Regions:
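Amphipathic, non-transmembrane alpha-helical scaffold segments
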Residues: 29, 33, 54, 58, ...
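Glycine-rich N-terminal loop/short-helix segment of MobA-like nucleotidyltransferase
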Residues: 11-26
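Phosphate-coordination/substrate-recognition cap region in phosphate-metabolizing enzymes
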Residues: 40-128, 187-211, 215
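Short, hydrophobic/glycine-enriched beta-strand segments
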Residues: 3-9
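ANL superfamily AMP-binding
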Residues: 32-48, 158-164
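Glycine-rich phosphate/pyrophosphate-binding loop
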Residues: 121-147
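Active-site-adjacent alpha-helix immediately C-terminal to a catalytic or transition-state-stabilizing loop
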Residues: 4, 62, 70, 75, ...
Length: 224
């Protein structure tokens, strides 16, 4: 049997302010930092040990990883992969969710947020939150906007190409990512329908343990 831990980053500044975040690189709140430390304490108390970790390119996931491992009292190698980034929210990035609903209508915003294959408006070239010229994404085709279906298309190959071989080699892994990249991964693992996955809520800072059989099929999962 194999175990892998999935952890959504702690509360970010824009989570707190109810802004669309996407690929915008925002920090954790103090509460988010405490969530990361508490996650580490829970993992330590559960006796979980890791050989390797993965985060997205976004600092809210990196800082969550650092604080979680510090709270566990361990120092393991971990690396970032852009395919674990949050869903790109296009021109909605940086906008207040309630004000956006007032501007475009609550039904339209809900469609952008919670449908499986509908993309929000593409980010404009002059938008201050456009990452296309960010040097850390050099060589990567940065999306202009993504649906959850688009996130699945990039997350599943990451799992198949990177994580599966490591698990088969009995590596113990922790992944710190964002709500929608974890939704995409869970959809694949649990073979969920689009309707099921868009209704799934993943809390910040709560370790989610997946137990997998020798074929890497889920046996069960649970939060600590």
């Amino acid at each position: 049997m194999h175990k892998i831990v999935l952890l959504r980053h702690g509360e970010s500044l824009w989570n707190q302010q109810k802004l669309f975040t996407g690929w915008t690189d925002v920090d954790l709140t103090e509460f988010g930092r405490e969530q990361a430390r508490e996650a580490g304490q829970k993992l330590k108390a559960a006796g979980l040990v890791f050989d390797l970790g993965f985060t997205s390119y976004l600092k809210r996931t990196k800082l969550t990883m650092e604080l979680t491992l510090q709270a566990m009292g361990v120092d393991i190698p971990w690396r970032a992969d852009w395919r674990l980034n949050e869903r790109h929210y296009g021109n909605l990035q940086g906008l207040n969710k309630e004000q956006t609903a007032e501007q475009f209508g609550a039904e339209q915003v809900q469609l952008w947020r919670r449908s499986y294959d509908v993309r929000p408006p593409e980010i404009s070239e002059d938008n201050q939150y456009n990452q296309k010229n960010d040097p850390k994404y050099q060589g990567i085709v940065v999306p202009s906007a993504e649906s959850l279906a688009d996130v699945v298309v990039r997350v599943v190959p990451f799992w198949q190409e990177v994580i599966e071989p490591l698990l088969r080699n009995n590596q113990r892994i922790i992944i710190v990512a964002s709500g929608n990249s974890l939704r995409a991964l869970i959809k694949y693992l649990d073979q969920m329908t689009p309707k099921e996955i868009i209704e799934l809520e993943i809390p910040t800072g709560q370790p989610l343990i997946y137990e997998l059989d020798d074929q890497l099929q889920p046996i069960k999962h649970y939060y600590l």
